[in-house]
Amino acid sequence: PFYTNHDMGRSAGYYNGDNAEEKTKMAQAMNLLMPGNAFLYYGEEIGMRGTANDETKRLAMRWSGDSKAKGMCVGPQNAEETEQTYDTLDKQMEDPYSIYNFVKQTISIRNAFPEIARGTNTFEKDLSNDNVCIFTREYNGEKAVLIFNPSKDEASVDVSSLGVNDAVAMLQTTKKAPSYKDGAAKLPAYSVLVLK
């Protein structure tokens, strides 16, 4: 699956106002944790913006704030000036809460558990609600449960019926972390919990 490509407006531009960064991160997590092969268009991992004409959707990668730094380029011609909300890659690499580090962590989780990408996907409709979306993925005898909270509110859900014991990975867009104990999952706003 892909969330954006070179013919579409960049995803960070979809979200404005309160919680725009958290929504941008959550959208990346939902895309990258879908089953199948994931695709990440360059610049999405740092929240680049670009809409309107094709040239503006294909702005040069923002490696550094220094226009003369190694790897920097200009163009394309006819691109509209676009205000960028988030820092360049070099700065985001140093910030543990940046979009870049969130995307990097999401990809690490995807790679650590093959059932996420390759598994048979089951939407747990009876356990999901307005704030929580739950999927079970099974592959080669392994099972993972992914719980997404894409809302601005904290959410709790009992998943004891799914037969999982431990939280093995989590993604948080704020400093508040998800938790899991005795079948009860508690997720702060805009977070993900992976259980096995």
Where are these regions (language model features)?
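Short, glycine- and charge-enriched coil/turn segments that flank and shape catalytic ligand pockets
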Residues: 20-21, 163-166, 181
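C-terminal beta-strand-rich structural cap/linker in extracellular carbohydrate-active enzymes
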Residues: 180-196
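Short beta-strand element of the conserved SAM-dependent methyltransferase core
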Residues: 61, 135, 167, 193-195
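Loop/helix patches that line or flank the sugar-binding groove of alpha-linked glycan CAZymes
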Residues: 2, 10, 16-155
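A structural detector for beta-sheet-dominated domains
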Residues: 64, 126-128, 160, 171, ...
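Beta-strand-rich binding/interaction modules
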Residues: 154-174
